[in-house]
Amino acid sequence: MTARISSPSLGAASYQERGTWTTAVSHRWQYSDRHFVGDEEQTVREAEGSQVINNVHVVDLSVSYAVSKRINATLSVPFQFATRSQAVRDNRIPNQFGNGTVIDRYQTSASGLSDIKVLGSVWLLDPENNKKQNVSLGLGVLFPTGQKDHKDVFKVFATNSAGVYTPRAETRNVDNSIQPGAGAWGIIFDLYGFMEVFENVNVFAAGTYIATPQEDAGVNDGPGTTGQIWSVGDSYLFRAGFGYTFLPKQGLTFTLGGRMEGSPSTDIIGDSGGRRRPGFAISIEPGLVFAKNGWSASFSTPVAIYRNRERNFAGNSGDAAFADFITLFSLGRSF
């Protein structure tokens, strides 16, 4: 699954005074190697050593400005560093599962600037009179600044005149799941709400949906101009849970929530054709938040409890690699 939504804030929000700047750095790590078709895990892939392994790091630099205590503007500049390991099969030699025997592996990679985001958000209720509950709505733009067609060398099965395996090097676009950019403009819809239910205990809910009206970015999955064109799909992240400030003087809060993240089969705006891997993961997300004297930090580890590689727009099934867990870290400073 593609990972392009970086680390969100956790727990209850704190209002910023007019003129306040907040800078932050966040990191997301995702190691995907568990294959699913629908919600059925394809354990044969690991057993025969053919699983695809995506290792993705996303570092996000952001700055936000409080236009007023009610209105905020945020600029987010992400950088992605990713590798993808995959197998080479010899179809002349079937293994115990009836597939070609895995005889080699190779790795492709891509890194660089990802897609920049600009977001404006507003608290619906007056912060002065609603210190213990509020709802924020946000609207933004995703800019196609990340490279959509990074290329690397693939190892393709081939033999010499004696029939001995002699891999052929083939330069092509790396897989869509590790491309730094989506290759299209996007519209960002953002929602966040919190409410204090007891002293030092709050509940929260958040959602981000990135709509990409463009059907595809003209990037194919084969050598040269061959193969299928990758679709530009929407993406989403929904979270809900509670936070308990167990050490108020130290500014420490424990959070626990549910998380659903993925990419749909059908976009809400525009066409949905082309090749894509729709699906989602549902996770339990424990976390820890620190906020004191203008500093803030958060760490969470969503652990997957359900994964589903859905059928695409045309009704075709396929597999996708999911992670068992991801790690999210952020550090911020307001001044």
Predicted feature locations:
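Surface-exposed strand-loop-strand hairpins of Gram-negative outer-membrane beta-barrel proteins
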Residues: 2, 29-58, 177
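Short loop/turn motifs that connect adjacent beta-strands in outer-membrane beta-barrel proteins
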Residues: 11-20, 32-35, 70, 126-135, ...
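Residue-level signature of outer-membrane beta-barrel architecture
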Residues: 16, 27-29, 65, 77, ...
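Residues that define the transmembrane beta-barrel architecture of outer-membrane proteins
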Residues: 19, 55-59, 102, 110-116, ...
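Transmembrane beta-barrel strands of outer-membrane/channel proteins
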Residues: 25-29, 75-79, 137-143, 205-209, ...
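Outer membrane beta-barrel transmembrane domains
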Residues: 36-45, 210, 214-335
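Membrane-embedded beta-strands of outer-membrane beta-barrel proteins
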Residues: 61, 118-120, 137, 189-191, ...
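Outer-membrane pore/translocation modules
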Residues: 82-231
